[in-house]
């Protein structure tokens, strides 16, 4: 089992129970899932770019990505409905905790000119979204084999009812928020 999951059960639950004075352990917010999304708009011209992006996402997450398709046609972007334009992965359970641990301890500190993550990126319901400009911050990606530096969106979905609860949950994991 992931160390971060054990830490959550042993330390974080107790800390949040006292901080928000919950009546039950089940009221304590928890991380439900982590979604990684990589939009590859250039895949319209070259299908190989989407395959490379999917391979990168599979290496980072340890799970085969789902190819996302365009919902509607947009003439300005030269896309038609049903065109493959990206890939995404939803992590739950053990893989989610392992990825979350790697994200906090290894990947985020490797971001160039890193001064902390914005605490304003909550959606109003306790879920946190962040963007990564380079996939090479993850140790699974070999810098020499990268065909193109591409970013991704990372969404951490929690069971928190408010942004304050979600912020407290992530801060308990030593999430590097900007001061």
UniProtKB/Swiss-Prot annotation:
InterPro entries: Ribosomal_uL5 (IPR002132), Ribosomal_uL5_bac-type (IPR020930), Ribosomal_uL5_C (IPR031309), Ribosomal_uL5_dom_sf (IPR022803), Ribosomal_uL5_N (IPR031310). GO terms for biological process: translation. Keywords: Ribonucleoprotein, Ribosomal protein, RNA-binding, rRNA-binding, tRNA-binding. The keyword Ribosomal protein applies. The keyword Iron-sulfur does not apply. One of its GO terms (molecular function) is rRNA binding. Gene3D superfamilies: 3.30.1440.10. GO terms for cellular component: ribonucleoprotein complex; ribosome. SUPFAM superfamilies: RL5-like. Belongs to the universal ribosomal protein uL5 family. This is one of the proteins that bind and probably mediate the attachment of the 5S RNA into the large ribosomal subunit, where it forms part of the central protuberance. In the 70S ribosome it contacts protein S13 of the 30S subunit (bridge B1b), connecting the 2 subunits; this bridge is implicated in subunit movement. Contacts the P site tRNA; the 5S rRNA and some of its associated proteins might help stabilize positioning of ribosome-bound tRNAs. PANTHER family: 60S RIBOSOMAL PROTEIN L11-RELATED (PTHR11994). Part of the 50S ribosomal subunit; part of the 5S rRNA/L5/L18/L25 subcomplex. Contacts the 5S rRNA and the P site tRNA. Forms a bridge to the 30S subunit in the 70S ribosome. This is Large ribosomal subunit protein uL5. The gene is rplE.
């Amino acid at each position: 089992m992931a160390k971060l999951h054990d830490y959550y059960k042993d330390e974080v639950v107790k800390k949040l129970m006292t901080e928000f004075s919950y009546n039950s352990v089940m009221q304590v917010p928890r991380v439900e899932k982590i979604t990684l999304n990589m939009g590859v708009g250039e895949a319209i011209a070259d299908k190989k770019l989407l395959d490379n992006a999917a391979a990168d996402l599979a290496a980072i997450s340890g799970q085969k990505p789902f190819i996302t398709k365009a919902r509607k046609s947009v003439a300005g972007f030269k896309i038609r409905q049903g065109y493959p334009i990206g890939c995404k992965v939803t992590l739950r359970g053990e893989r989610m905790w392992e990825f979350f641990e790697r994200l906090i301890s290894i990947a985020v500190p490797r971001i160039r000119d890193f001064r902390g993550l914005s605490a304003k990126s909550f959606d109003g319901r306790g879920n946190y979204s962040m963007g990564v400009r380079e996939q090479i911050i993850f140790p699974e990606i070999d810098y020499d084999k990268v065909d193109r530096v591409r970013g991704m969106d990372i969404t951490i979905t929690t069971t928190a009812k408010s942004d304050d609860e979600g912020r407290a949950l992530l801060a308990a994991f030593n999430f590097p928020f900007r001061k």
